[in-house]
Amino acid sequence: MKYLMASSVFVLFILAPSLALMNPGDGHPQEGSVGSQSIRVNALGSMISIRDNNVLSEWDGILDYENGLLAAKLFSKMACVLTKMDKAVFPTLDDISKALDHQALKHYPSTRGLTYTVLPSRVKNLAQYGVPIKDMCRDVPTYFAQQQKEGTALAIDPDSCSEIQLLSFLGLSICGEIPGL
């Protein structure tokens, strides 16, 4: 009985705190930073939050894998953009967790870049996209964006584009004039 009590105390005080630091289900760290980006992975909620402090392209982002959404708050434009993620191109939740775990992004080269065009209509009800997106985009106008098909010519002023990088996996161009700015 004495040994059972001692092993219970060991589990309670020694193992439990170390298990709390692990991501349930896969053991990868829940947050990390790479370059100018801070990343938080919530595997249970199928969501990744990104904060990029790069002075040339500062942005916050949420990748909502459950709903297939990308939300990006572009500080240079003082606006948020909401779009569908192309699951064939975007890195998976597991890819990003592995990259954070190994901190070896040279093994995860950039796959390709995507271009999105901002649509003129504003998002009226952010709450329907979940609390994290609503909170991030609360104080700025939010617009939908549409992915451009690869190989189509864009009649867009290249100076209207904001370039963002998702780790080393993927470059995104969000182009178009934001109405009212």
From Swiss-Prot:
Keywords: Disulfide bond, Secreted, Signal. May inhibit gastric epithelial cell proliferation. GO terms for cellular component: extracellular space. It holds the Pfam family BRICHOS. It comes from Sus scrofa (Pig). It comes from the Eukaryota. The keyword Protein biosynthesis does not apply. Residues 53-145 form the BRICHOS domain. Its main location: secreted. One of its GO terms (biological process) is regulation of cell population proliferation. InterPro entries: BRICHOS_dom, Gastrokine. This is Gastrokine-3. It is found in: Secreted. Disulfide bonds join 80-137. Belongs to the gastrokine family.
